[in-house]
Amino acid sequence: ASETAELVFQDCRVHKSQVLGKVGDGFIQAMKVLDGGRISIASLALGIAKGAYDASLKYSKECQQFGQPISSFQGISFKLADMATQIEAAELLTLQAAALKNNGEKCTKESAFAKYYASEISVKVSTEAVQIFGGYGYTKDFPVEKFYRDSKLCTIGEGTSEIQKMVIAREILK
């Protein structure tokens, strides 16, 4: 769950001595903060995806069908390969955005890339994890059901995936 609230400043007056920055620049300042927030959400999504992947990898090596671990079946091994590749790509995008931010460079496009891709693959990886676990993946006895639920929030917070696409499009079309 997340705590979400509406702030209303109707007929609100602020004394000159209490104004931070220049009057009218609040939106610009808020947008600058979003870059860092998007990197944070990308990191969160990446952690969820890694947790789902790690649990799936372990389970697929332990779970036996027809006298062999399910990881030996091509359908499962291909899922694991896709998951690992997507996680690696998301991590590189996230690290690139974080490095730019840490160096004080503009990172609007890169943070949107990272947030969009990492959050979307978090959902995909978590969904595949549930598939690998089968019916167990939907129960609270195993961790992947929580990864599955938690991953979706990452596609919403700090701007939905659709907003990230708008930001990316705006940046690449400049």
Per-segment meaning from a language model:
Residues 1-3:
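Fold-level recognition of mixed alpha/beta catalytic cores in primary-metabolism enzymes, strongest
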Residues 6-12, 16, 22-25, 31-174:
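Alpha-helical interface subdomain recognition
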